Amino acid sequence: MDLKKLEGIFEGMLFASGDKVSIEKLSSITGIDKKTVKLVINNMIVKYNNDPSRGITIREINNGYQLCSKPEYYDYIKQLFEPKQRSGLSQAALETLAIIAYNRPITKAKIEQIRGVNSDSAITKLLEKNLIREAGRLDAPGKPVLYETTDEFFRSFGFKSDADLPIFELNDIHETVEINQNSEQEKADTELEKQEKA
């Protein structure tokens, strides 16, 4: 098949999808092997990124591709949409998300064992934001739910796959959680002292 036609097919499929399309899907629909799919799309990415007249690019996300607007045009593109109230993630939610990202799939009990505190609220928030999802149940008493990160997580944080996650040891996460817990305790103690003096 002609290369330009193949690029047009991939571009049309990614545009129509509006979401990530897996390499397997692109390969099975076009009848082109996965290696060639990757080569063609990586070539398209280079073309898009080197052409300032193009407002779009293709992002690789977790063994798939998505057609996206270029980040440098964000200030213009955001004006097309109604302003939305977007609340950031709390420290607790970020800790929980990091634990899930590095240990997926993982149960709530294990998350709470690592954090040392209840994580219901953080997990609910992450589910609402589609950064994590249920990934089945552990084959253990009570059949606890397992959690894992989603494609939205990779998209939001700019990672292609697990291989792009910064390298941390579980001990680093434990230390960060402990530091944050100590910091919260210090804030609470300071506030209590102020109230006692007043």
Swiss-Prot record:
InterPro entries: ScpB_csome_segregation (IPR005234), WH-like_DNA-bd_sf (IPR036388), WH_DNA-bd_sf (IPR036390). SUPFAM superfamilies: Winged helix' DNA-binding domain. Pfam families: SMC_ScpB. GO terms for cellular component: cytoplasm. It is found in: Cytoplasm. Homodimer. Homodimerization may be required to stabilize the binding of ScpA to the Smc head domains. Component of a cohesin-like complex composed of ScpA, ScpB and the Smc homodimer, in which ScpA and ScpB bind to the head domain of Smc. The presence of the three proteins is required for the association of the complex with DNA. This is Segregation and condensation protein B. It comes from Acetivibrio thermocellus (strain ATCC 27405 / DSM 1237 / JCM 9322 / NBRC 103400 / NCIMB 10682 / NRRL B-4536 / VPI 7372) (Clostridium thermocellum).
